[in-house]
A protein has these predicted regions:
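Asp-based, Mg2+/Mn2+-dependent phosphohydrolase catalytic module
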Residues: 1-27, 34, 38-39, 43-57, ...
Length: 156
């Protein structure tokens, strides 16, 4: 279902994105670029952002509805944060694409969840990259949900 599947975000390079014809990168928040519910970015994530921000428009698209949590995120990074995105509903992603005056095919949606992140990208007409969690030490319920999602997706 995803156009690309990678171990984590750090495998995404500017060259790869340029070769894909991408001008904007929309990123899921929890478990994709930030350890889930931590409210903090890893130092290597900030370094990765630095490699991308000069060539690409970057935005965070999250289903998170906690205003304190998204406030922390907005303070920590200089990118647009679209909260309460209601993924996989593509409405907010399409609105953001329109706002930045790009074509859907110039955007890539990156996330760790096939049934939310990848589907929203597909519904909005963007390219998609499915990545593994940024956290190798996820709790058991999260690991089970992730395995079930990926198992279901393999059948489509």
């Amino acid at each position: 279902m995803a156009d690309y599947k990678l171990k984590n975000i750090y495998e995404i390079t500017p060259k790869m994105l340029l070769d894909m014809g991408v001008k904007a990168v929309f990123l899921d928040l929890d478990s994709t670029i930030m350890v889930s519910k931590s409210g903090k970015f890893l130092p290597e994530t900030y370094k990765w952002f630095e490699t991308l921000k000069k060539d690409f428009y970057i935005a965070i698209v999250t289903n998170n509805k906690n205003p304190e949590y998204t406030k922390l995120t907005k303070k920590a990074i200089p990118f647009k944060v679209v909260e309460c995105a209601n993924k996989p509903n593509p409405k907010k992603v399409k609105e953001l694409i329109h706002l930045i005056a790009m074509k859907p095919e110039e955007v890539v949606m990156v996330g760790d969840r096939p049934l939310t992140d990848i589907l929203v990208g597909k519904f909005a007409g963007t390219k998609t990259i499915l990545v593994g969690s940024i956290n190798d030490n996820e709790n058991l319920p999260t690991k089970i949900v992730r395995a079930l999602e990926r198992s279901v997706i393999r059948h489509f």
